[in-house]
Amino acid sequence: MSRTIAAALAVAALAVGTATAAPAASGLSPTFTTCRDKAQGAVEQAACLTSESARQDQRLNQAYRQLQAKLSGAKKTKLVNAQRAWLQSRSRDGELDTALYDDSQPGNLQGELNDVMRLSARADQLQKYLQLLD
């Protein structure tokens, strides 16, 4: 019984965390927000996160390629080095998420949400750099 209560509390905490965490990255898609709001259960939430992760990864890669095309020499090298460092940081943050959150569905969902937020924040940052160059 206490495991059931703990699981219910974890799902409730995730729902609150998701609702408050999502606006932090401005590039999250309206599709994700709608999907998340309509999701009923962990499987549907996971599907929303998987789709949004793919969207954010595509957005990040597009911004990165556009920046690479606009930069040359030392600036381009700095971009490549910064992106490599970000990828390492993202990986380490994911490892920390895995260590901190349990292996339950809510823990896994929170880890995935955190990664989506990291992707979105990095894509936002790269798009701001593009705006500086325009």
What are these regions (language model features)?
Residues 7-17:
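Bacterial N-terminal signal peptides
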